[in-house]
Amino acid sequence: MSQSYINVIGAGLAGSEAAYQIAKRGIPVKLYEMRGVKATPQHKTTHFAELVCSNSFRGDSLTNAVGLLKEELRRLDSIIMRAGEAHRVPAGGAMAVDREGYAKAVTAELENHPLIEIIREEVIDIPSDAITVIATGPLTSDSLAEKIHALNGGAGFYFYDAAAPIVDKSTINMDRVYLKSRYDKGEAAYLNCPMTKEEFMAFHEALTTAEEAPLNAFEKEKYFEGCMPIEVMAKRGIKTMLYGPMKPVGLEYPDDYKGPRDGDFKTPYAVVQLRQDNAAGSLYNIVGFQTHLKWGEQKRVFQMIPGLEHAEFVRYGVMHRNSYMDSPKLLTQGFQSRANHRLFFAGQMTGVEGYVESAASGLVAGINAARLFKEEEPLVFPNTTAIGSLPYYITHADSKHFQPMNVNFGIIKELDGPRIRDKKERYEAIAKRALADLAAYLTV
C-alpha cells in the first residue's frame, strides 16, 4: 500500500474510536475535526466524542442488548468504553458518565498518541484516492453532506433528534421528590418526581398545547422513535406517556413521603425521573424529555413537574436535524463503501442509533480500514454477537423502509434449538454465546 497513513474525518464517538483502533495497529492517522474552527448547532465544546443528548450509555446488564454490546467493546479495547468507565456517575442499573470528564479523557488520549495527527479544519470533499473513514455524524456540515448524499443518488434522508433539558439540583424542591431506581436495581440513582392523576392530566394538557419552536417549511418531520420529543409523544395519547418515560411501575413511594398522592395508592399515577448529569451531582437531566418546545414554554410546562416548581434550567431542550445514509445500498458489513472500497463510514450517519452503537461502528470501521491498509481481508463479526448484528442489520434491511436502529436482541441471531421461554434466561444464553463467539476475534 503506497499510502502512509489513514484519514479519519470527524472526532465524535465513532471517529475517535476508529482513529484509536487504527493507531493501535501501528498505522499513522490524520484525524480531522472541524469543531474549533467551525461550530455545529448542538455541540458545546471542542472535545472529542462529546455527548450532545443524554449522558447515559444505557443499561449495563448482559440481559440488556446494549449491556452486551458494551461488554463486547470492553473486551475489544474500546477507548470510548475505557474513558466512560473512568468517569462513571451513579445511574442505578445503567451506565452514565460525567460528560465533560469523559470527553476530556478521550481527547487527551488521542491528542497524545504518537501516531495520531490532529487537524482542526473542515473537510468539504470526500478523498477518493486514500483510505478514509468518514464519521462526521448526524450533524455533518452541509458541504460534505452534499457529497455524501451524491453517493446516495441525492436521496434526502433525514429525521429530527431532540435533547432533554438539564436543571440545577440546588433549585429542585426535594420535599416533592424521592431517590430511587426502578425496582430498586443497583444503587438509588434517580430523583423521582411523582404525580397524582390530577397533576398528570393538567401537565398532559399543558404539554400538548404548548408552542413548539418553528421548523423550516421545506423540512418534513421524521422522528426516530428512540429520541422522540416528549410533546410529540404526548399527542399520541395519555397511555403513550404512562407506558413510556413517565411509567410509574417499580417506583413506589417511600414510607416517609409526605407529598400529595391518590388515596392510599403505593405507586404514583405517573413519574418523571431526573438523572445525574455530571460527576459533582449538581446537574440533573429530565429523562426521556427530549423536546423542541420554545424555551419560555419549556419553563412554563416543565415547572409543573412536582419538585421543579422553581427549578433553574441550565440548558433547555433543543432540536436538530440528523442525516443518515441508505446503508443497505451503500455499505458492506465492514462499513466499507460499495462504490469506493477505500472509503469507510461510521457512526449515526450509517443508521446505527445511540452512543454505544456509534462507538461500535467506529471500532469495526477502524479495524477494517487498518486491514485494508495492510492488504488483509475485511473482518466481519458474526451476527451471533451484538457488534456483528448491527452492521448485519443496517446492510440487510429493506432500503425502501430503512430507519436508524438501536442494538436489541431482536436483531441478534436466534439461538439454535428449542426456544427458551423465560426471557431473562434466553437473553443470558444469547449473551453467553455472543461472548464465546467473540473470543476468536479478540486478537485481530
Swiss-Prot record:
GO cellular component: cytosol
Primary residence: cytoplasm
Record key words, sorted: Cytoplasm, FAD, Flavoprotein, Methyltransferase, NAD, NADP, Transferase, tRNA processing
Presence of keyword Repeat: no
GO MF annotations in UniProt: flavin adenine dinucleotide binding; tRNA (uracil(54)-C5)-methyltransferase activity, 5,10-methylenetetrahydrofolate-dependent
UniProt keyword Transferase, yes or no: yes
Protein name: Methylenetetrahydrofolate--tRNA-(uracil-5-)-methyltransferase TrmFO
Source organism of the structure: Streptococcus equi subsp. equi (strain 4047)
High-level lineage: Bacteria, Bacillati, Bacillota, Bacilli, Lactobacillales
Gene: trmFO
